[in-house]
């Protein structure tokens, strides 16, 4: 069962778990766990995608309950009328607030994108980022005696493939758990010492104008246990009040206070 964050007669939003595909492609024909099919079975209605989240990313996934609803939502995404907010745990101390305007060359998959043009130049890519908190943990990683992490809020203003992951890697603050653009030593250390066994990138919030009612709509997605455990271990509880789960209890030996 997927957590349904919002549903009306036109739209449905779920909290996509890390590791789930949004829908099958011919490359993933045998995949058993797929968001679209699970939601369809769960609510007894066909759903229509309007945007995507990478497989390792968790958080708000918004779909239409008709082809028209899906089309109108997709149009809003394409025209950048929907505000997306993400949170990430990154390597090092990223403390400033700034806008990164750094064009990206399209990443092509050798199989899935074999018919795509390879001669496209860099495409505009803009991300607003803001450091929320930092921590230094007494765990050696590589040649350093301690390990530093940062909690970052991200708002992509464009929608390039892997944009947030690539932009943070460009800033030399790759997201923990990013196997393609990240720091392998940091990924291993985070998994071994702090249970960061996934890409630490979460789609926390979507804000839009409802395509049928015209009313403002904001949808929040709660954090999973890996995220909640990280916030507890790093002393960051209470920094993401709209996404932290009040029912989470930290493992023994860690800060187990419940925030409200």
Swiss-Prot record:
InterPro entries: PsdUridine_synth_cat_dom_sf, PsdUridine_synth_RluA-like_CS, PsdUridine_synth_RsuA/RluA, RluA_PseudoU_synthase. Its EC number is 5.4.99.26. CDD domains: PseudoU_synth_TruC. The active site is at 54. Pfam families: PseudoU_synth_2. One of its GO terms (cellular component) is cytosol. GO terms for molecular function: pseudouridine synthase activity; RNA binding; tRNA pseudouridine synthase activity; tRNA pseudouridine(65) synthase activity. Responsible for synthesis of pseudouridine from uracil-65 in transfer RNAs. This is tRNA pseudouridine synthase C. It comes from Escherichia coli (strain K12). The gene is truC.
């Amino acid at each position: 069962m997927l957590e349904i964050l919002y549903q009306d007669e036109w739209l449905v939003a779920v909290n996509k778990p890390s590791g789930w595909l949004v829908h099958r492609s011919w490359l993933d024909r045998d995949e058993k766990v797929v968001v679209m099919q699970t939601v369809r079975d769960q609510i007894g209605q066909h759903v229509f995608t309007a945007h995507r989240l990478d497989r390792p990313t968790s958080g708000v996934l918004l779909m239409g309950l008709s082809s028209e609803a899906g089309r109108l939502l997709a149009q809003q995404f394409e025209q950048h009328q929907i505000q997306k907010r993400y949170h990430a745990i990154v390597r090092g101390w990223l403390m400033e607030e700034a806008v990164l305007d750094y064009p990206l060359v399209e990443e092509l998959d050798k199989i899935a994108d074999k018919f795509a043009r390879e001669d496209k130049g860099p495409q505009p890519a803009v991300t607003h980022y803001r450091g929320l908190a930092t921590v230094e943990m007494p765990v050696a990683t590589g040649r350093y005696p301690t390990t530093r992490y940062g909690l970052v809020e991200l708002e992509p203003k464009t929608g390039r493939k892997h944009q947030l992951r690539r932009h943070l890697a460009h800033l030399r603050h790759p997201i923990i758990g990013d196997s393609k653009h990240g720091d392998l030593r940091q990924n291993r250390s985070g998994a071994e010492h702090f249970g960061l066994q996934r890409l630490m990138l979460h789609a926390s919030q979507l804000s839009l104008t409802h395509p049928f009612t015209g009313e403002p709509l904001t949808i929040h997605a709660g954090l999973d246990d890996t995220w909640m455990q990280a916030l507890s271990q790093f002393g960051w509880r209470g920094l993401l009040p709209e996404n932290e789960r009040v029912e989470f209890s930290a493992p023994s030996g860690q800060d187990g206070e419940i925030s409200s």
